[in-house]
Curated annotation (Swiss-Prot):
This gene, also known as the 'green revolution gene' has been introduced by conventional breeding procedures into several cultivars. It produces shorter plants, increase grain yield at the expense of straw biomass, and are more resistant to damage by wind and rain. It is found in: Nucleus. This is DELLA protein DWARF8. GO terms for biological process: gibberellic acid mediated signaling pathway; regulation of DNA-templated transcription.
Amino acid sequence: MKREYQDAGGSGGDMGSSKDKMMAAAAGAGEQEEEDVDELLAALGYKVRSSDMADVAQKLEQLEMAMGMGGVGGAGATADDGFVSHLATDTVHYNPSDLSSWVESMLSELNAPPAPLPPATPAPRLASTSSTVTSGAAAGAGYFDLPPAVDSSSSTYALKPIPSPVAAPSADPSTDSAREPKRMRTGGGSTSSSSSSSSSMDGGRTRSSVVEAAPPATQASAAANGPAVPVVVVDTQEAGIRLVHALLACAEAVQQENFSAAEALVKQIPMLASSQGGAMRKVAAYFGEALARRVYRFRPPPDSSLLDAAFADLLHAHFYESCPYLKFAHFTANQAILEAFAGCRRVHVVDFGIKQGMQWPALLQALALRPGGPPSFRLTGVGPPQPDETDALQQVGWKLAQFAHTIRVDFQYRGLVAATLADLEPFMLQPEGDDTDDEPEVIAVNSVFELHRLLAQPGALEKVLGTVRAVRPRIVTVVEQEANHNSGTFLDRFTESLHYYSTMFDSLEGAGAGSGQSTDASPAAAGGTDQVMSEVYLGRQICNVVACEGAERTERHETLGQWRSRLGGSGFAPVHLGSNAYKQASTLLALFAGGDGYRVEEKDGCLTLGWHTRPLIATSAWRVAAAAAP
């Protein structure tokens, strides 16, 4: 059947004098219509009124979507011919200059129902939280660069062996029949998947989002007659829910040693993470890498080479600059040490992890400004051996000695090389050639993010605390991550670390946005070099927490309550840090870019620093209990 378009202004029969009146009226209407016609489109031969522009644009967009769904990807011309069969060569559309009517006629042809698909055996439903399947030939044509195709009918991909509590049940497809169709951008090839719903709890509020998809018959036919269909993501919220569910389901599969199911989920995680932005995408990428290392049993190597040792120091320095966590740790510990040294003429600090010595210039300067003059200051720095046998600890001592000389502080330094703190003995920390006629040294022991590493070796922490107790320090300052990554099952540890590092990455994003850094396209320019390197610094911790076990897993963080129990059981009593340290720490954060999101809290005499409502690090001070003193 041919469709003809009749001009509204066409001629009729001979009507005598009435004809002249009608022509005059038509001429007047034509002049009015000519005034309303868009001039730019009229120059191209199309008659479109300015008032009809919005309607024509909407119809063109619908036409483009309908024709674009015809399989412009790897299916080739065959899919196009089958889907747009109503636009055959024998169909004629007259007068395309009247663009509105012409587009409407095209849409009427496209909206005709297609031929029914042949019946096929229904594909198995997935027990996973994700209702997506990866494509083969059309991979990479849509939003994501998709991984290799995974056969959804295989027992590996069907996650039935995992009775995950975090998996969202699939909804009945019949409930979606009355729902209005949504605009979806897809990869190449026809799109179909089962309809599913997911929900997440955010502060006690349940949020749900739904994926619109074709009925199961279409999915079964596509699985039987063509390549696997691409992923269809309606919005980033739905993809984010799927991403979290995939991470948790993969961790549960690892715990159950169902590595075939875990491998299938590991392949989904990068695809789902690529739809996210900001901190969530970065955290998911690091956790996905850590899970992949655990599934494929590819453990991260220890920092044994010269390059790794130098890189670790570089990451630590960038982490110090990008966020206030290390600054807070150094400041609160120094404040406690300064108060303990009040009125003392000879002081000695033992630093269990001196690294680049960034903590001590501030304390030296505070002692130099003390009324009555600075005391004699001795510093013992402990550090690991260097792969190239260089004396890096001595180089740190030279720099600190030069600084102390400029502010006129009597300074002595000694470096102790130890592969682990458990190798230290009490005599190594005692004063050399101590003159009994002089005032005795007052000792302070400082540990920033060091004690948790000892938990990987049975009995190591108890030995180190016994060594500390033997030298009778006036104060012991301890800074540790406020997290529990050292107890429970692997899934519990994974879930806790996912929450912890998500908050940590959020704080980095907030600090970077508050500092007004460059918005160039490159990652280093967009987030700043310090922020990018700090993310790598945290990513290495994530990899150790998730991918490693046994003695290799050194990032065994524990909460403040757990450290209070350990130190109290080893003969130490807590020292209240006081309100002065709290006020000064709050002032320090106010000066830091993006400090609005950071929160300092005082908890049982200890200070914590967190992002919004989540504490992330904690500083505590201790002394040898009277009953435990030798």
